[in-house]
């Protein structure tokens, strides 16, 4: 098993994994047609933009060249939390859930953010994503705000969660 920072050449594989994870993790939240319409090419463009500006590094976790999960993090993009570090994405392949890979990625990203000088960390999560909310609660995050998320022509409730005052 290996954890490392992603490089430009890894972004296509990360984009494909992200779409794969959305399709299984959000199948009861988003419309099937919307999930199937997502393109790896479109995801790749978004990941590439974050990679190019250096504000959204990816930590990758894999085994023998197979990407099992990744975590994106950096400065906060969440309105109202400009001084926080943010975990912007964490996805683990479905058959790798429950093996500690998500925990390893998540805690490493937190450590990196703290090392960059952030005291508080923020993230957002779909309100219906009970598995993720339980994961974040177990890592010390608390819900601090509600917001809406637009995707595929619909609005979805989201929770903003925060972990405060790391010294």
Predicted regions and their residues:
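Short coil/turn segments at alpha/beta junctions that flank glycine-rich nucleotide-binding fingerprints
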Residues: 99, 115-119
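C-terminal "cap" of GNAT-fold acetyltransferases
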Residues: 85, 119-133, 138-139, 145-167
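Acetyl-CoA-dependent GNAT
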Residues: 5-29, 33-95, 103-108, 112, ...
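Extreme N-terminal starter segment of soluble prokaryotic enzymes
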Residues: 1-3
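Active-site acidic-Proline motif in GNAT/NAT acetyltransferases
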Residues: 93-95, 99, 127-128
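Residues that form or flank phosphate/diphosphate-binding pockets in enzymes
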Residues: 82, 100, 131
């Amino acid at each position: 098993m290996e954890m490392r920072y992603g490089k430009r050449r890894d972004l296509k594989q990360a984009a494909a994994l992200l779409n794969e994870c959305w399709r299984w993790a959000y199948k009861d939240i988003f419309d099937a047609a919307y999930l199937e319409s997502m393109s790896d090419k479109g995801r790749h463009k978004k990941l590439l933009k974050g990679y190019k500006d250096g504000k959204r590094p990816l930590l990758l976790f894999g085994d023998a060249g197979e990407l099992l999960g990744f975590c994106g993090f950096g400065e906060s993009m969440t309105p109202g939390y400009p001084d926080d570090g943010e975990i912007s994405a964490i996805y683990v392949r479905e058959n790798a859930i429950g093996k500690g890979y998500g925990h390893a990625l998540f805690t490493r990203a937190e450590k990196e953010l703290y090392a960059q000088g952030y005291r508080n960390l923020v993230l957002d999560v779909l309100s219906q994503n009970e598995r993720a909310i339980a994961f974040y609660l177990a890592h010390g995050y608390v819900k601090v705000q509600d917001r809406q998320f637009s995707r595929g022509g619909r609005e979805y409730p989201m929770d903003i969660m925060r972990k405060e005052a790391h010294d």
